[in-house]
Design a protein with these regions (language model features):
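Short, surface-exposed ligand- or partner-binding patches at beta-edge/loop junctions that are enriched
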Residues: 82-83
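Rhodanese-like catalytic fold shared by cysteine-dependent sulfurtransferases
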Residues: 1-24, 31-79, 88-129
């Protein structure tokens, strides 16, 4: 059985993160993106955004480090919500999280900062690092 990540809207993701103690947000963009457009600000719900620089090289070493990060940072029953610019990298990150045993993985398909009006940056708190 192949389990696919659950697609979730940005506003629903924020609501979910605020209500579920075992939920975590993982931003899979690059450090350049984080610095230029900001990151999701979860301080109002007493949480921090987890940052994973996704790429530019996605080789075996990267995926081993990614797996180790997930296993050392979260419980496998936790709810992991992944976000990137437009929903593509976060989908891949969530698919691999499921492969590594984190079946409660979500993809914020509207992304952080894409062309549609429903993205995180337009509707939800942002902070700059």
């Amino acid at each position: 059985n192949i389990v696919e990540p659950i697609n979730i809207k940005a506003t629903d993701a924020f609501d979910f993160l605020s209500k579920k103690d075992d939920s975590h947000l993982i931003d899979t963009r690059s450090d350049i993106e984080w610095k230029s457009t900001g990151i999701p600000d979860l301080s109002s719900i007493n949480k921090e955004t987890n940052l994973i620089n996704w790429g530019p090289v996605l080789d075996q070493t990267f995926f081993e480090q990614y797996k180790n990060f997930l296993l050392s940072s979260f419980n496998q029953n936790d709810n992991l919500l992944f976000i990137c610019r437009s929903g593509s990298r976060s989908l891949i990150a969530a698919q691999f999280a499921i492969k590594f045993g984190f079946e409660n993985s979500f993809n914020i398909f509207e992304g952080f900062y894409n062309e549609n009006d429903q993205n995180w940056k337009k509707n939800l708190p942002v902070k700059f690092i």
